[in-house]
Regions:
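Bacterial N-terminal signal peptides
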Residues: 10-24
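Hydrophobic beta-strand segments within beta-rich accessory/binding domains
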Residues: 70-87, 131-134
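Extended, low-complexity, turn-rich repeat/linker tracts enriched in Gly/Pro/Ser/Thr and Asp/Glu
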Residues: 87-94, 139-141
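Extracellular beta-rich ligand/substrate-recognition surface
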Residues: 57-67, 111-112
Length: 153
């Protein structure tokens, strides 16, 4: 390869790396999703101390006040699960409930909701698909970002 072609190839490769890599390395993340997830993790903290293993994956989105979102999850008999919901919006009220595949409420009585945090507890009687219903009951924001995390033991 002649010297000019080598320099041109190296320069082009370097320029491509400068243009492409920063966008891959510094991908933009919506800060409201990060804050909502931080609140969900905060709700999970006491349960993690009790031996629940928190999954790294989570669900997130935004909802208008009074709207709901269903998330389907495979749960296994013999395990115990907590689902933690959080939002960064002050004065928002959120809730989370768990239903079995027949549409019956399946969560334990110790599930709770307080302001912009909520949690639902389930000990599945059977292995199968369950539906976790996330709801923004009320919010001062037009759209309320939320994040749902879960753990098991």
């Amino acid at each position: 390869m002649n010297p000019f072609a080598k320099v041109l190839l190296c320069t082009t490769s370097l320029l491509a790396a400068i243009v492409v890599l920063p966008s891959a390395i510094f991908a933009w993340v919506d800060p409201t999703t990060v804050y909502a997830r931080a609140w969900a993790i905060l709700a999970a903290e006491p349960y993690v101390k009790q031996g629940f293993h928190m999954h790294e994956d989570y669900w997130c989105g935004d909802l208008a006040s009074g709207k709901k979102k269903a998330v389907r999850q495979q749960l296994f008999k013999g395990n115990e699960y907590w689902f933690w919901l959080g939002t960064e919006v002050d004065h928002a009220k959120v809730s989370v409930h768990i239903y079995n595949s027949d549409g019956e409420l399946a969560e334990q009585r110790d599930s709770w909701a307080k302001d912009h945090l909520a949690a639902a507890h389930i000990i599945p009687k059977t292995t199968g698909s369950y539906f976790i219903i996330v709801s923004v009951e009320e919010s001062p924001a037009a759209r309320t970002h939320w994040a749902l995390a879960y753990g098991f033991r």
